[in-house]
Amino acid sequence: MDKVMAQLEGLVAHYEELQEMMADPEVINDTKRYMEISKEEADLREVVQKYKKYKEDKKEIADNKEIIANETDSDLIEMAKEENAEIEKEIPELEDQIKILMLPKDPNDDKDIIMEIRGAAGGDEASLFAGDLLRMYEKYAERQNWKVSMIDSEPTEVGGYKRVAIMITGDKVYSKLKYENGAHRVQRIPVTESQGRVHTSTATVAVMPEYEQVDIDIDPKDIRVDVYRSSGAGGQHINKTSSAVRMTHLPTGIVVAMQDQRSQQQNREKAMQILKSRVYDYYESQNQAKYDAKRKNAIGTGDRSERIRTYNYPQNRVTDHRIGLTINKLDRVMNGELDEIIDALILYNQTKQLEELADQNA
């Protein structure tokens, strides 16, 4: 904890500098700079407040010990002892909170995401489950006051999806949904099953941070752009003009199709935005040394083929295999009540990081 405390002293000094800068008229008049400083100040606020409370508690304990050692009034001594007993209960919890707040932040945690859900093993039932997962994430996003927009999809005749891609925007979306990467298994009796037998199917979920233009630069020569007539909803206009856009990143073979915007230019811009995220994600995933180190003590590997969760409908049960968590409220989970699972995953990851930090400091 001593090393952490030494870091915190510097952090408090920097936090106070940021507050002074935010009151500087020159900074106030520079909107971009003010927003950057304001965000950094907000990011540090909680850990600084916790540390100040920790120091206050430590000082109060020391003051009370002095009273206990030097005071002759028995009532004052007893009061000081009682106060210290209460404060000393707070200290370990404060230390843990500070350690967690000081853990290295995932630089992508504040980002919006692109999520792809694919029906995998199980045919029609897998595609139906992909649709169920889509609705589950849509309802969860609604509970978080996030916005969901459709990118593209391949619906199936039975009402599911062979593949569906959505964008979710809001506050710290990636920080909560990054743990959804992997294979999701469902056990249930399909509507087409006449014998009442339970079938097992899977759908895969891929979660990618939405990267801004500054994060990655793609050579225009590496992109092939095809335009074609849009299909589906949109009225007569959408079928009369070649407004749909398909972009192919030649070095990786990644393809993005976009047709939900009204103009070709809008579809181009959105397709490029999504293509950049997918290309960046592709190259990041190739860097195994970096990922292995990053995920050494993380939850699973984040591999999209790794089975992470089972949804058992007959028993109304959900099991997350990475942390051994089982909850018997599948109906509520599928209705978007994912907080219990996601909070447990975040806590597990933080605990593993703290253990690694303790090993390094040992």
Curated annotation (Swiss-Prot):
| Record GO cellular component, one term | cytoplasm
Q: Note the InterPro entries from the entry.
A: PCRF, Pep_chain_release_fac_I, Pep_chain_release_fac_I_sf, Prokaryotic/Mito_RF, RF-1
Q: Where in the cell is it found?
A: Cytoplasm
Keywords assigned by UniProt, alphabetized: Cytoplasm, Methylation, Protein biosynthesis
**For this protein, what post-translational modification is recorded in UniProt?**
Methylated by PrmC. Methylation increases the termination efficiency of RF1.
> Which GO molecular-function terms appear in the entry?
translation release factor activity, codon specific
Similarity field: Belongs to the prokaryotic/mitochondrial release factor family.
* Protein name, per record: Peptide chain release factor 1
**What gene name does this entry carry?**
prfA
